[in-house]
Amino acid sequence: MLKLSVGYQYNERFCFSKIVSDYAKNIEEVYFPWIDSASGRSMIGGYDGYFDYGLQNILLDELKRIKVMGIKLNLLFNANCYGEEAMSEVLRNKVYSVIDFLKDNEVKPDVVTTSSPAIAFVVKEQYPEIELKASVNMKISTVKGMQYVSHLFDSFCVAKECNRDVERLKTLKAWAEENNKKITMLANSGCMRDCSGQIFHDNMVAHEQDISKQKNIKFVPYMCWKYLEDKKNFVSVLQNTWIRPEDIDRYEGMVDTVKLATRAHQLPGMVIGA
């Protein structure tokens, strides 16, 4: 049975660790960003320079509850851009400080997912016991793409465009097994397939705190909104990369883990339960 990688969500309406406990036997890992850290989604507890650091204790408590269940913790450093700090000692020290803090609080991550080869390098150098996973944001979809960074990563969350290409997934999985690597796929991405605006959007998310301080133009940065205004394009929804819950078992032997996007979903428990 394929197990799930699910994204932590803080919400005043529910306790995420309780949702995890309800489906613990089906969950391999819980992925999460640290507060005040850029990732592939908005920062936890932060907006326009204000951070609710009280959430730190809530997150630590939730992570401890999850770790006791025997579920792996997957720390995210998957922002699409780290600006001028991209390969700096400052960024290295920030990464180390978060991992060391989590270790001191008995929730050391088992896995680190990143879109940055530089972050993968410094984590592997200092914490060789931590699994390094290439973010789906790296859009790796070929054996060659994995080979380029195989010295840095132990596993790969492959591009969502691979999801309905069974032969491609089999090829990726065969190479991974031969090279002691693992494959994860993202089953329910909210993005359109082959979105030409994704890199632009991901860069905006990485810099959203800075962008919020600017006098911005009237522009919708989500290409799908304009595209789907035209009804003739509705068929693209069916052509996307999302995988139906009833089809997950068909991917047994082609991937090792199925990632679910639950960090921004209103009903994460429903997604996991499905």
Spans of model-derived segments:
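Active-site pocket-lining/capping segments in soluble small-molecule metabolic enzymes
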Residues: 1-144, 153, 157-274
